[in-house]
């Protein structure tokens, strides 16, 4: 895990492997504690690259963009 303090919050970068995909997560936390997340991953079965966006306060992806 990599964590960096910014002027208006913090950013945390972690890697993950959930069995279906592996990639990284970038989590931004503002000074009020609100979090937003972008995950960049590759599906293991198809090799499809994705960007998954979670808006502040959302547990489910708000958008999934296929990159290839």
Each language-model region and where it sits:
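Residue-level signal for functionally critical sites in structured catalytic/ligand-binding pockets
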Residues: 12, 40, 67
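Acidic, low-complexity, intrinsically disordered interaction modules
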Residues: 16-61
């Amino acid at each position: 895990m990599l964590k960096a303090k910014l002027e208006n919050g913090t950013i945390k970068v972690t890697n993950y492997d959930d069995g279906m995909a592996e990639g990284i997560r970038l989590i931004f936390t503002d000074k009020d504690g609100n979090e937003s997340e972008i995950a960049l991953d590759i599906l293991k079965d198809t090799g499809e690259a994705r960007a998954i966006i979670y808006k502040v306060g959302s547990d489910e992806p708000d958008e999934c963009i296929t990159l290839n």
